[in-house]
Amino acid sequence: MGVRRSLAALLAALLGCATSLVALTVAASPAHAAPSGNRDVIVHLFQWRWKSIADECRTTLGPHGFGAVQVSPPQEHVVLPAEDYPWWQDYQPVSYKLDQTRRGSRADFIDMVNTCREAGVKIYVDAVINHMTGTGSAGAGPGSAGSSYSKYDYPGIYQSQDFNDCRRDITNWNDKWEVQHCELVGLADLKTSSPYVQDRIAAYLNELIDLGVAGFRIDAAKHIPEGDLQAILSRLKNVHPAWGGGKPYIFQEVIADSTISTGSYTHLGSVTEFQYHRDISHAFANGNIAHLTGLGSGLTPSDKAVVFVVNHDTQRYEPILTHTDRARYDLAQKFMLAHPYGTPKVMSSYTWSGDDKAGPPMHSDGTTRPTDCSADRWLCEHRAVAGMVGFHNAVAGQGIGSAVTDGNGRLAFARGSAGYAAFNATNTAWTRTFTTSLPDGVYCDVANGTFVDGVCDGPSYQVSGGKFTATVPANGAVALHVEAPGSCGPDGCGTPPGGGDDCTTVTARFHATVTTWYGQEVAVVGSIPELGSWQPAQGVRLRTDSGTYPVWSGAVDLPAGVGFEYKYVKLNRTAPWSGSRAATASPPWMTSGGGCSQNFYDSWR
């Protein structure tokens, strides 16, 4: 199958192609509220290098109002070249040293924490404290910082007596004792009931707190008895004064079932709400979102729930809705940021093809490449929803009201008098006059742009008498809030400042994850002459190499403001081309990039 997208225009945020049916020549801004102090949105920069995270905090996360970054495990881990350095090697600790991991050095880690704090962004560490290494890793060589080990022997840290006696895999998941004392997929299960083990784990976490870490995701928390985990957490220090000086924020990975519920751990901190992931993912994947005002009802209490569309496990092993359906995936993440239930965690990851254990873009020695959102296999999904983080912050504490639906795939609602959002999970645009509680004035559409340092780079809409008219893009959204004033040009609202005339051409950068056979090439073709007018031989050839395969990339200059359709084709030596058009879909309106350029990320299996 090919991948085909229908564009109303290249990019609304750059070219002003989202439209309002209200035409204005003069428009006053409302009395907008001061920026909210609420910053609780977490972004999981999965497998990112420490230096790349520091850069992202400074340039993107801080300015857009993200509250925290969940970083990958920072402790020394196994190194598995025979497995092509899989992502999960990082979840097998060899020691609690921070000296060297695939993501950088201790000094790099410290600089990241300090840089992010200066940007107003907390660091939450993914803490692997239930276990050490697994059976398959024994004999693989020293850890990432050079430490020797065997499955039940870690010189200077743990010996055989520090592990539980049930040295076999969990087989009966209905037996709570077995789930918490036997081995998870062959990983050496620590005897967390031991005061010595509790002290060692607490010392590791306290070292991170001393370096400025503000919180922890407790990996595999349900496999640690509640009392043991409470004993460990009771030993923790207070966090940096910049974060209030209290105890660190704790959220625990608890995949609830009939044996162990999320409620078993909420007295220790927040928990990851996996049922939310299933509910929101199915709803947006199926275009059935009209009922979602009540999302979260019957689940973990909102103040204890960390919610997500996908995480690094579910995108591989429970892939209901992922980046491979980018439009609906981005739309679901935007909805999560607009809805009041839970503490949202946005995913940002990388692509892989076929092999779900594949590590991030890396050098030949297995260390991670710097993140480049326009190259390699990095997806940088959080940038596509960055504008909605400000919406989430601005409407904190406001409930849902004035909800309207149009069939199963369209839903709009107010967040009190602080914001209004509309979502369209269908393949056709939705034009409507919406009734809000917003003060009259002009607002920036942060679903299709961002508002940073007083500048709106997306469309604007005028609210008059509490009403505004908008066309919500197919598989898109519109979102307005009181902390993001907009502006209207001489041609009215619905366009970015300047009327979208700043760019005469736009550089379109295509990044397609495509599996090919030897001798095949990949091209992008489309409905305009610059993309070959659907003629494969005239399309734009994409390139790859051993370091970036299966991601094929290429760029072409296109006329600004011109709508087009495109797809990918495989070019063969023995046949002219192969590939077919897929169903029409709308791409994300806001992806990574800036200036007169736009990135397109797609996957074609």
Curated annotation (Swiss-Prot):
Alphabetical list of Pfam families matching this protein: Alpha-amylase, Alpha-amylase_C, CBM_20
Name of the protein: Alpha-amylase
Originating species: Thermomonospora curvata
SUPFAM superfamilies documented for this protein: (Trans)glycosidases, Glycosyl hydrolase domain, Starch-binding domain-like
Record-annotated site: Transition state stabilizer: 313
CBM20 domain ranges (all copies): 500-605
Family stated for the protein in its record: Belongs to the glycosyl hydrolase 13 family.
Residues at the catalytic site: 219, 253
GO MF annotations, alphabetized: alpha-amylase activity; metal ion binding; starch binding
